[in-house]
Curated annotation (Swiss-Prot):
A lipid is attached at residue 16 (N-palmitoyl cysteine). It comes from the Bacteria. It is found in: Cell membrane. GO terms for cellular component: plasma membrane. A lipid is attached at residue 16 (S-diacylglycerol cysteine). It is a lipid-anchor. This is Uncharacterized lipoprotein YjbF. To E.coli YmcC. The keyword Lipoprotein applies. Residues 1-15 form the signal peptide. Its main location: membrane.
Amino acid sequence: MKRPALILICLLLQACSATTKELGNSLWDSLFGTPGVQLTDDDIQNMPYASQYMQLNGGPQLFVVLAFAEDGQQKWVTQDQATLVTQHGRLVKTLLGGDNLIEVNNLAADPLIKPAQIVDGASWTRTMGWTEYQQVRYATARSVFKWDGTDTVKVGSDETPVRVLDEEVSTDQARWHNRYWIDSEGQIRQSEQYLGADYFPVKTTLIKAAKQ
């Protein structure tokens, strides 16, 4: 089902209580205002829609909302209307101003479909396409997963205990690590992934998950 989050913000600003209107205005300013946003506990508590923080290629932290959820994929929109698409927490496509992740195949076999069931040594192979300095690249990427201890993820004043999942990825030309912070229910609370082969890091921190 498609859910246009930006329209939802507009509806929130037109109706509901003064408190909700103030929240809507605050989030609107965060979405289209200065990067590096940090929402307050009240903002997070009253959040009416799915959202997360993202950091692109070492840039400032952005507040990102879920624009659409369809066919098992979630499409997140940045404050400058760039789009990042995830599936089961994995970045699978981007529409940014510069370089992009073009595609990832074999997603039906991705162990992240059920992260809590991953065992050390689990593996996955796929083809990925991306642009690097505007040049199109394709490679076969091979992943090996292992658990790497425990941690906590903090959003506002709330701390969630998590297990850390390490994904070692290799192609014929490069090797890198993606990492995922996963709670007791199998929800990916935080991640560090790469748009290409050891190129263009993307960090995510979940604020509010989309409804299943």
